Amino acid sequence: MVDNRLSPHGGKLVERVLDPKEAPGRIAGLKTVPVKGQTVRECVSLAYGFFSPLEGFMGRADVDAVVNKMQLASGYVWSVPLVFDMPKQQIDELEIRTGDSILLTFREKPLVILEIEEIFTYDKELMAGKIFGTTETKHPGVRRTYGYADHFLGGRVTLVSEPIIREPFKRFWKPPAVLRKELAAKGWERAVAHQTRNVPHTGHEWLMKGAWFASQATGVLVNPVVGEKRAGDYIDEAIILGQDVLREAGYFREDVHAVSLLFWDMRYAGPREAVFHAIVRKNLGCTHHMFGRDHAGVGDYYGTYDAHKIFDTIPDVGIYPVLTKEWYYCPVCAGITYEGLCGHQKSKQKFSGSVIRSIIQDGVKPPRLIFRPEVFDVVMSAAEEYGFGSPFVTERYLAEAQPVLTMPDVKK
């Protein structure tokens, strides 16, 4: 089943957010279940339509279709399960039944109403093997899957209130309905999306510029993922501000570059996650999505360009994949060049994220040819203001940094 380009996946943008006047009456008397982290972020993204056509967490039929056929029960392409897990003991203690509505809360504030349509179990090893191509627990996505509780609750979610987004993320929070209007106002008839979880070096910059040329796009939408962090990752503040300064410093014109955030916890599902990213950016209003080497990969679980090949095996999802190889520095050409264009193969120098990170860790400004000085300055400023002195996630950051989103009280 294929729907039209420029329309949301499934043809209709989901938006399930209560009017503030309705909220007190709708949540009165509901059983409450506290949630955190991944579940909070997915609830917000579901309610605002980032994951259209999903209106909530999947039931068994959808999970089964996604796991085995890479599609929803309705027939639309979908590649990654979205589930809400709960231990049977908790289900029994709260006397939760199919047909009930429960209130999920975050930090003791109302988050979403979950209308329970189904309570079911699923083979987590089967799920992991099909989605990630492995059942090895050293794969982070497999560990996440095995960490789910023994039961799942499927059903629609409705956001109780608009979330509060803290600085510096507030201006980058643009739900699909808002972002689509902004892209239309910019006149972006052809928008190419860039998925990232990194501070940009010039290899990333040229990946974006190359995709812009290749797709004949009107603009580039940089859409960093904000989700679970591990020690050693770049802090989210450095990532999103570093991406934004590329435009502010003139490396992209004001009218061809924009940044917005996506609440999503990476699954590292390689080619399957590439399909998921394409669908989400389609919902944001993009017509194209760039995919470079090792997209959404981890370790050596996937081939370098598996995320390219998968689009030849699935039905058209309504967004054009822009498949790019590698940009690197050539000392003979004295500049950044593209795989297959430059003839100095023996001289090419690949961008090393680990080397760049070690230079930044020492507080040394890398050569501008591989890392823009304005990006470095913004990253170091973010380290001081948000990272307790480090541009990388530390144990202190994990313990003390405030969540990117919180929920307000519901006024009666």
Task: Locate each region found by the language model.
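Active-site cores that bind ATP or allylic diphosphates and position pyrophosphate for catalysis
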Residues: 1-412
